[in-house]
Structures are given as structure tokens and as C-alpha cells.
Curated annotation (Swiss-Prot):
Binding site for Mn(2+) 3: Q820, E832
EC number: 6.3.4.16, 6.3.5.5
Keyword Magnesium: yes
Xref: SMART domains: CPSase_L_D3, GARS_A, MGS
SUPFAM superfamilies named in the record: Carbamoyl phosphate synthetase, large subunit connection domain, Glutathione synthetase ATP-binding domain-like, Methylglyoxal synthase-like, PreATP-grasp domain
Binding site for ATP 1: R129, R169, G175, G176, K208, I210, E215, G241, I242, H243, Q284, E298
Protein name: Carbamoyl phosphate synthase large chain
Length: 1057
């Protein structure tokens, strides 16, 4: 069938900021789709609010709008651009919900915009729980016993019929937002009221829990001629009851008989045909482990996290082909880009095993609720490929960067068996490692199966890993056992531990005996057809399929799984670096392990190695490829942390030298450099023990900022006000030692400024300076950043420029550098320097049209910035005002305090741009999910030190017409200044302020931290209540003041004459 010629211009809706449940997989899908549509000759217009994506680069679409993904803003773009069609199925849940809103409001019809891909009725039939259930009943496809409710009372009526446990699934949400498993009345009430709040349709499905069934997924494609195929089927190792995004997944499924596989395949294809889906679709099924009974759980009528995984697992580009199906092409006329010879209608076959393990944020949020259920909590994931299940699992484990390298915890032997079993009984993020620990202690697989309902197949594989450990222990130095352990994915580190040797001894032994991995190709067809893809994984077999060319090569280290503090911004820089390497005529090689990202799309680099980012795995690739050098500055802390280890093997680190990287990180050397170049920093000292930290803090004077050296995202960083708080920090948050010192710095309050620069060793180019709205003390990743700076004097700007050039030259930077400054009452101080790409690089690149990562890579390869046409110093400003606003995922993480401080907590970001600061801020806040209203009620409860400042904000909000509620102390302060205020009661008393929030009487809460950081504090309860009820809560008065500016600019003040 020829493609559609009745449309020329297509609007693609992206998925917006990265949140838990909707991450980089949509950047990958959206990028593929836009390029595929352009390839077919269509004009593509993209709208997305996330600047940290490749898809929002100018080259990806004909026109790119970085605007909030709300009905009003997209409607404006439709009226301006007059597209012929809208493609909503590549923007995650956000894209689908936007399509439904634009259709329901009549905007699509009024502007003659057609929907491409799956019909709206089909989307609604799959997403609306009631319609879906009806269709399944018509098809005789079993669904769990369930009911649709719009109120909490209806949920309790259903509970009377079927009893507990129950699963709650809100309609039209993703990542299980608002849902959960309920075992009693209190949980049912909380989860259903939450779910109704988060569902755009105020609708929840309540179903009888089938927790314990196997969870199986089929990733399917269908075109308009009813050709339908299964791209990949996947099995969750965790049974039904844990969200698939939080489950350990294996592909292809390992425990299904042929009868079961074909039965579920037939059902999946039957459902996708009945729904009339055109494009990609994900079908989730539950299978009774003891019979052929099954249920269908849900269908996602769009490209999803699972389809990104299926694409990387098989090499079959689902999003690209889904976009082409949407414009009328069919599976039997499109070639599979991997083989270049077989058609897309051939189902992929795999001759390897894929393991996916989620990456959770609990290393950041140690007090967070770790137990897993139907609401997703992982921020990212890793994937590994092996010839055996054990090999792929162990490779995935060491890709996580949790400090775990194997099936066990670092100090696992110190736990009591009772504690281990108790932890296995809770479904949490560490259960896999505790199972390994239990098997080591001799716990039977039967007992483990009864506790976890994990299939015996997987438990036997875990047992096999532990058996190999014992064999290694009993055969120290035996090469046969070394080879055997390598076949099953054991790392040198783990073997060394079993043999009481050093990791480097095992590495050298392997090299001397020629025990090295070979690299196999991922080709979608189990080597049946000739394949041309440069996509490889390592394994210990005989035949190497990765042919080394004689071209000069540069190897780029990716940034691994997405986590708080290291997001898609680093993938963005990695991809741009690769493009620059290719343009310079080198062969570009990527090593990465994240299945969601653009960098692991096989069409980006000349060669892709899907491998763990560890010293051993990277060295194996370097030994084969012999690159000219390795680039570490684009892969975040993951890559930087490998630089030292690789250099010890004689590998050339390209760009800023290892000595200079270490000088930026080492406290004493850095201080010496600052003295030499006359750049001031806040007074600070290094402590290697709690006693020394107390001595330092008293000398410097409180408040002080304390943190471990070498961290990204401000991990374990705190501002402390007295000896007691410092002692708590030193004993609970960190283990200080001479190898791991703790830094104690004077805490300066003032404006925080962030600068990114590029240097070639001679010239330092500064694309722009960003001013933070929140004062120093809030992590830069959680602050609202503004370009160009709005309140700096020319002298301050000149000083920032001067210090940036001195620092870049003093550290001999080749490539990128990111610097944070604070402007205190007595001048500019440097807070920290990162000699690498940063999370603001994509934002600044978009604003200034200076492709920073590409310029940096060109400088690393020896081009000068002068040759590229750049002059030293700050570059001319772009017109307009731009803000980068953080986006948080607190609604997915229970027990996490939302107060902003030096520890980073945001998962993503949006950009707002307009002619004035207030308009840009309005877009930034709106894009981040904050509904800015010109009237309403604000609740204020602030600490004593903030009471003077809150008076000004309250006065301005009162002038606009906002009603003010406040707790007693704050209210008294406002009354003293003649500001009308209503006093609300403390928690637990009469007229409880929490009840006011829960009843929807409050639109904004302003609450600042009172010290005494324990969870019991009232402030914590207030902040969590705002999250559970979807009320914006501001914990920084700077943000509150900025918001007040925005509201003032939208409205009029009312004053009597």
C-alpha cells in the first residue's frame, strides 16, 4: 500500500519531562518517529517541553516547539501551523491524553486535523477500564473479576463481594500512578481516593488480586491491512502484583511451554486486531503457573517502556516502523533496517537471553518506602545480553552501579538469616540480592518459591550461580573453573574475591591464558539472514563477529541507567559527541547499557557495544578495538569514575587529562590552584573522622555544608546548624575515613549562578550564564535557572567571566567545564567545578544555538575554537528569556520529604521561553505540572527565620485577592502587619490544617523547614499531604516570590482609593 498523500504536515506530540514511569524511552521513540516521517517526505512539527532531549533538536523535525504540553498551548500551535494530522502514540501517556483532550474540546475538528495511527475509539477502548472490560467479555478473553468505581463508597461495595487483596488501577494514567494493592479498609480508602484524584476521568478499576500469577508481556505490531506480528515476548521474574516497570524482566520468556506461548500469542494478536490498533502495542497477561488459565491485565495502545526494551532486545525498530504504519505503509512492504534484506513482517528470533533490571532511587531516598507494588518507583533501567540466563543476569546486576557486582549484598554475610527471610517476604528493590544470600545459607528453593512465587526455573538459575561460587572456592587458581565461571557471567572482581586475589591478578591471568570474550551481533533473526548491524554483546564463546576495521576509532562511554542526578542530559551530550567524531572522519564506538536511550539506538554510532560500564567490560572492548582514545566527559559520573582505572591500563583519556580531572576533585590541590589564580571560595576544611569534622565546623562557624568528596547530584549532602546535627550526619549519613574524607564548608547565603564553558586549552567560550531563582543551598538540579541573568550587575558578570576563564585555563580544560558560583554580600565565590558535561548543556545548547557537546568534542580532537569561529568570553545573548524548571516524581515515592536542599530530588526538567521573565516562568511552571491560578487560597506555615520575608509575599498575594490561611505563629506575624489572615489549627487539633488540604480548600502551600529533621515533624506531614492531594507546595521563599511575580503579571491588583 502506498503511503498517504492526503497529508503533508504532521504534528508529533512528545512526552514532556522525565518522571518515574515515563523516561528516556520516549525521547528514543520520538526521535525515531520524526526522522522516519521526514524520510517519507512529510513536514514534521514537534512539540515537547523537555529541552534535555535529542528529539527537540532542530535537525530532528522541520519545526520544533519547546512549549508546555497542555491543551491550551498545543491548541495555539495547531492554530498557528495548521497541520494536516496529529500523531499522538509516541508521546507516552501524555501524548495520548492530549489527543483525547484536543478531540473532546473540538480543536482537532475545527482545524481539520486528522489523528494518525491508532483510532481514537481504539485508544479509548484500551485506556477506559469499563470499555476495555466490555470488549474482552465480547471476545471471551478472561479479565480478573473487577468493578469500575468513581467514588470510594463504590469501592467498598465491591470489596464486600470479593474480599481482599484488591488491586486498584486508575484510568488514563501511566506507571500505575495513584494505584496500588490493598489488604485492608484503611489502604483501600487511601489508594482509591488517590487514584480518583490522579485519573483524568476520575475512574478506577478495582479488581480481585491475582498476585502470584506469572506476568507475561507481548510486544505486537499491526498495520491497516491487518498484518500483525509479535516482535518480542517477555517474562517478568516477579509475579503479578509488581509493576512491570519495577520488575526484573527476561526476554524471550523462559518458562512457557510451546502450548502456553502460542496460546498467549494468539490472544495478544486477537486483542490487537479487535482494538484495530495500527502501530505498536503492548499486551500484559497473567498466567496461572499450575494450569492453562490466564487473564489479560491491560493493553497499552502506544509505544511504551516495554517497546523500547523490545526494540533494543531484538534490534527491531518498533517506533520507526510504527510511525510509518501510521502514514499507511504496511509491514510486508517495509524492509527491516537491521538486516536490510528481510521484511518487517518477519517476526524476530533471538539466540541469546536479555535481562532488564530496574534502577531505583533509594540510594538517594534512604527513608523512602521501598516496598514494590502496582505503582512504579524505578527511575530507569539497565539491560544486559548473554548466551545463558545466568550470564545476562549477572551482567545486568553489575550495570546497576549500586555498589553490587553479584547476586548478593556487599556486607551480606553480616545479616541474620531471620532478617534475610523477613526482607525476602517484603517485595522490595533488594529482594533479588537477599534471595542469593538465603541460598548461600542453605535455604531450600521450595521455601523461597512459597515466599516469593518466583518460578523454580529462575530459582534454580540463582542456585546455579551460588553453586559455581562454591566450586570456585574449592578450586582456587584452576583455569578450567575460571573459564566455566566466565561462561556464566562471573566478573573478575567476584572470582578474585573467591580466590583471595586482586581483580587485576585475575585480569592478568586471563590475558596471559587468552581467556577473552568474543562479541556477537544482535541481528533480529538468530543469524538466519545476513545482517549489517553494528550492534554487539560480549560472551565467552569461540567465534567473534565484531570485525575490527583499520579506521582510527574513538570510544565514548555512555552514562548508564537514568537516576536522580544523572538523567537524559548526559545521553544527549553522548549522542552529540558521537556525531562530531563521525564528522571528523573517525569511527565512533559507544559503550552503554541503558535500553531507553537514543545513544543505544544502533543507527547512531558506527558500533554499539551493549555492555556493563565497568573496568573489566570496557577493557575487554578496548583490547579488541584498540581505539585512539576514550572520551569520559559526556557520560556523567559513571564515565568519570572509570577514567582512573582505564588510565592504569595505559588507555589514553581524551580531553582534559586525568591529573587535571583529579585536581578539580581533590580538595587540597583545588585549593592550591584557586590561591594561584586568585579565585575565592567559601572557607572549608576536610575531615576524616567525626571528631575532626566538629573541630572544623567550630573554626569555620555554623551553618556549614557537609558532603562526601566525589559525588554527583549532591548525594548525602546537608546544611547543618549545630554540633548535634553534625554528629548525627557524621554517624548516620557517611562513613568518613582517610580514603573517603568529608568536606566541611562555610554555608554562604546568596545568589547561585551556574556557568558552562568550552575550552580548547587556549580559548574559553562561555555560551551563557544562568542565574538560579532559589538562593544557594538548593541543589542546582532542583533550582529554577534563568537565562540571561536578570539581577546581576555588569561588574558581577565581568567577574564571573574572568573567574570562568581563569578556572578553565588553570585546570587545562579540553572540552567542557561546569562551574557553580555564589554571589554573597562581599563578592563572587566559586562553589564547585565539574570538569565534564553537565545537566545544563542541552538547555544552553537549545537557547544559544551553540552545539556545546559537539564543539567540545571537536576541541578534544584538536580543532581550535578560533578556527570554528568563536571568540573568547561570554557569547552574545539570545533574545527573550528562558527558564529551566525542575520536575519531581514525589507522588510515586512515599515517605520522601519534598523539602528542597543540597540533595537533588528532581527526575526531569522543562523549559519555558518567552519575551519576559514572568511569561517564561509561567510556561516553566505550567510545563512542570503546576497549575498557576489568579485567585484562590494559600496556606502559609514558615519557620521563625523566614517570618519577616513571608510578610512581603503575603502582602502581595493579598493585593491580588488571594485568601490567606496560616498557622498560629505565622498568622500572628501577618496580623502585626495588618494583613488579613485566617488562623488554622495544628495537626491533630480542631480545624486541622491537613483536613483543609485534603478537602481541596487550599490551592498553594508555602512551608519552610523547621530543624529537627525527623519524619515525625509536623512539617513533613504537611508536605506529604500536599503531594498525596496534588496541591503545589513551595519549600523555598524564592520560588514563592517568583510565583507571586507570575500571578501579578497575569492579573490586576485591587486597591481602594
Amino acid at each position: 500500500m502506498p503511503k498517504r498523500d492526503d497529508i503533508q504536515t504532521i504534528l508529533v506530540v512528545g512526552s514532556g519531562p522525565i518522571i518515574i514511569g515515563q523516561a528516556a524511552e520516549f525521547d528514543y521513540a520520538g526521535t525515531q518517529a520524526c526522522l522516519a516521517l521526514k524520510e517519507e517526505g512529510y513536514r514534521v512539527i514537534l512539540v515537547n517541553s523537555n529541552p534535555a532531549t535529542i528529539m527537540t533538536d532542530k535537525e530532528i523535525a522541520d519545526k520544533v516547539y519547546i512549549e508546555p504540553l497542555t491543551h491550551d498551548f498545543i491548541a495555539r500551535i495547531i492554530r498557528k501551523e495548521q497541520p494536516d494530522a496529529l500523531l499522538p502514540t509516541l508521546g507516552g501517556q501524555t501524548g495520548l491524553n492530549m489527543a483525547i483532550q484536543l478531540h473532546d474540546s473540538g480543536v482537532l475538528e475545527a482545524n481539520n486535523v486528522k489523528l494518525l495511527g491508532t483510532e481514537l475509539e481504539s485508544i479509548q477502548q484500551a485506556e477506559d477500564r469499563e470499555m476495555f472490560r466490555t470488549l474482552m467479555n465480547d471476545l471471551n478473553v478472561p479479565v480478573p473479576e473487577s468493578d469500575i468505581v468513581n467514588t470510594v463508597e463504590q469501592a467498598f461495595e465491591f470489596k464486600e463481594q470479593v474480599g481482599y487483596p484488591l488491586i486498584v488501577r486508575p484510568a488514563f494514567t501511566m506507571g500505575g500512578t495513584g494505584g496500588g494493592i490493598c489488604h485492608n479498609d484503611a489502604e483501600l480508602k487511601e489508594v482509591v481516593s488517590n487514584g480518583l484524584h490522579y485519573s483524568p476521568a476520575t475512574q478506577c478499576l478495582i479488581e480481585k488480586s491475582i498476585a502470584g500469577y506469572k506476568e507475561i508481556e507481548y510486544e505486537v505490531m499491526r498495520d491497516k491491512n491487518d498484518n500483525a506480528i509479535v516482535v518480542c515476548n517477555m517474562e517478568n521474574i516477579d509475579p503479578v502484583g509488581i509493576h512491570t516497570g519495577d520488575s526484573i524482566v527476561v526476554a524471550p520468556s523462559q518458562t512457557l511451554s510451546d502450548v502456553e506461548y502460542q496460546m498467549l500469542r494468539d490472544v495478544s494478536l486477537k486483542v490487537i486486531r479487535a482494538l484495530g490498533i495500527e502501530g505498536g502495542c503492548n499486551v500484559q497477561l497473567a498466567l496461572d503457573p499450575h494450569s492453562l488459565n490466564y487473564y489479560i491485565i491491560e493493553v497499552n495502545p502506544r509505544v511504551s517502556r516495554s517497546s523500547a526494551l523490545a526494540s533494543k532486545a531484538t534490534g527491531y525498530p518498533i517506533a520507526k516502523l510504527a510511525a510509518k504504519i501510521a502514514v499507511g505503509l504496511t509491514l510486508d512492504e517495509m524492509l527491516n533496517p537491521i538486516t536490510g534484506t528481510s521484511y518487517a513482517a518477519f517476526e524476530p528470533t533471538l539466540d541469546y537471553v536479555i535481562s532488564k533490571i530496574p534502577r531505583f532511587p533509594f540510594d538517594k531516598f534512604e527513608k523512602g518506602e521501598r516496598e514494590l507494588g502496582t505503582q512504579m518507583k524505578a527511575t530507569g533501567e539497565v539491560m544486559a545480553i548473554g548466551r545463558t540466563y545466568e550470564e545476562s543476569l549477572l551482567k545486568a546486576i553489575r550495570s546497576l552501579e549500586y555498589g553490587v557486582h553479584h547476586l548478593g549484598l556487599p556486607n551480606g554475610e553480616s545479616y541474620e538469616l531471620d532478617y534475610i527471610k523477613e526482607r525476602i517476604g517484603h517485595q522490595d528493590d533488594e529482594r533479588l540480592f537477599f534471595i542469593g544470600e538465603a541460598i548461600r545459607r542453605g535455604t531450600s528453593l521450595e521455601e523461597l518459591h512459597n515466599m516469593t512465587k518466583i518460578d523454580y526455573f529462575f530459582l534454580n538459575k540463582f542456585q546455579n550461580i551460588i553453586d559455581i561460587e562454591h566450586e570456585l572456592k574449592n578450586h582456587q587458581g584452576d583455569l578450567e573453573y575460571l573459564k566455566y565461571a566466565k561462561d556464566y557471567g562471573f566478573s573478575d572482581k567476584v572470582i578474585a574475591h573467591r580466590w583471595d586475589m586482586e581483580e587485576k591478578d585475575i585480569y592478568e591471568l586471563r590475558m596471559s591464558q587468552n581467556i577473552k570474550p568474543v562479541y556477537k551481533m544482535v541481528d533480529t533473526c538468530a543469524a538466519e539472514f545476513e545482517s549489517t548491524t553494528p550492534y554487539y554483546y560480549g560472551t565467552y564463546e569461540d567465534e567473534n563477529e565484531s570485525i575490527v576495521t583499520d579506521k582510527e576509532k574513538i570510544l565514548v562511554l555512555g552514562s548508564g541507567p537514568i537516576r536522580i542526578g544523572q538523567g537524559v542530559e548526559f545521553d544527549y551530550a553522548t549522542v552529540h559527541a558521537v556525531w562530531a567524531i563521525q564528522n571528523a572522519g573517525y569511527e565512533a564506538i559507544i559503550v552503554n547499557n541503558n535500553p531507553e536511550t537514543v545513544s543505544t539506538d544502533f543507527s547512531i554510532s558506527d558500533k554499539l557495544y551493549f555492555e556493563p560500564l565497568t573496568e573489566e567490560d570496557v577493557m575487554n572492548i578496548i583490547n579488541l578495538e584498540q581505539p585512539k582514545g576514550v572520551v569520559v566527559q559526556f557520560g556523567g559520573q559513571t564515565a568519570i569514575n572509570l577514567a582512573d582505572k582505564l588510565a592504569q591500563h595505559g588507555v589514553k583519556i581524551l580531553g582534559t587529562s586525568l591529573e587535571d580531572l583529579n585536581r578539580a576533585e581533590d580538595r587540597k590541590e583545588f585549593e592550591a590552584l584557586l590561591r594561584e589564580i586568585s579565585v575565592p571560595q567559601p572557607q572549608g576544611k576536610t575531615a576524616t573522622s567525626p571528631k575532626e569534622a566538629l573541630k572544623n565546623a567550630r573554626e569555620i562557624g555554623y551553618p556549614v555544608v557537609v558532603r562526601p568528596s566525589y559525588v554527583l547530584g549532591g548525594r548525602a549532602m546537608e546544611i547543618v546548624d549545630n554540633d548535634q546535627e553534625l554528629e548525627n550526619y557524621m554517624t548516620q549519613a557517611v562513613k568518613a575515613s582517610p580514603e573517603h574524607p568529608v568536606l566541611v564548608d562555610r554555608y554562604l547565603t546568596g545568589k547561585e549562578i551556574e556557568v558552562d564553558a568550552i575550552s580548547d586549552g587556549e580559548t574559553v567560550v562561555i555560551p551563557g550564564i544562568m542565574e538560579h531563582i532559589e538562593r544557594a543551598g538548593v541543589h542546582s538540579g532542583d533550582s529554577i535557572a534563568v537565562y540571561p541573568p536578570q539581577t546581576l550587575t555588569q561588574d558581577e558578570i565581568n567577574t564571573l567571566e574572568d573567574y570562568t576563564i581563569k578556572l578553565a585555563k588553570g585546570l587545562n580544560i579540553k572540552g567542557l567545564i561546569n562551574i557553580q558560583f555564589v554571589i554573597a554580600h562581599d563578592g563572587v565565590y566559586v562553589l564547585e567545578v565539574n570538569p565534564r558535561s553537565s545537566r545544563t548543556v542541552p538547555f544552553l545548547s537549545k537557547i544559544t544555538d551553540i552545539q556545546m557537546a559537539q564543539l567540545a568534542m571537536r576541541a578534544i580532537m584538536g580543532e581550535t575554537l578560533a578556527e570554528m569561529g568563536y571568540k573568547q568570553g561570554i557569547q552574545p545573548y539570545s533574545e527573550g528569556v528562558y527558564v529551566k524548571a525542575p520536575v519531581f516524581s514525589f507522588n510515586k515515592l512515599k515517605n520522601v520529604d519534598i523539602t528542597l536542599g543540597p540533595e537533588m530530588k528532581s527526575t526531569g526538567e522543562v523549559m519555558g521561553k518567552d519575551l519576559t521573565l514572568e511569561k517564561a516562568l509561567y510556561k516553566g511552571l505550567t510545563g512542570s505540572g503546576f497549575e498557576v491560578k489568579d485567585h484562590g487560597t494559600v496556606l502559609m506555615t514558615v519557620s521563625d527565620k523566614d517570618k519577616d520575608e513571608i510578610v512581603k509575599i503575603a502582602h502581595r498575594l493579598n493585593e491580588i485577592g488571594y485568601k490567606i490561611l496560616a498557622t498560629r505563629g505565622t498568622a500572628q506575624k501577618l496580623k502585626d502587619h495588618n494583613i488579613p489572615v485566617e488562623v488554622v489549627g495544628k495537626i491533630g487539633g480542631e480545624d486541622d490544617l491537613l483536613t483543609r488540604i485534603q478537602n481541596g480548600e487550599v490551592q498553594i502551600v508555602i512551608n519552610t523547614m523547621t530543624k529537627g529533621k525527623e519524619i515525625e515533624r509536623d512539617g513533613f506531614q504537611i508536605r506529604r499531604t500536599t503531594v498525596e492531594n496534588g496541591v503545589p507546595c513551595l519549600t523555598s521563599l524564592d520560588t514563592a516570590s517568583a510565583l507571586t511575580n507570575v500571578i501579578e503579571s497575569m492579573t490586576f491588583t485591587m486597591r481602594n482609593v
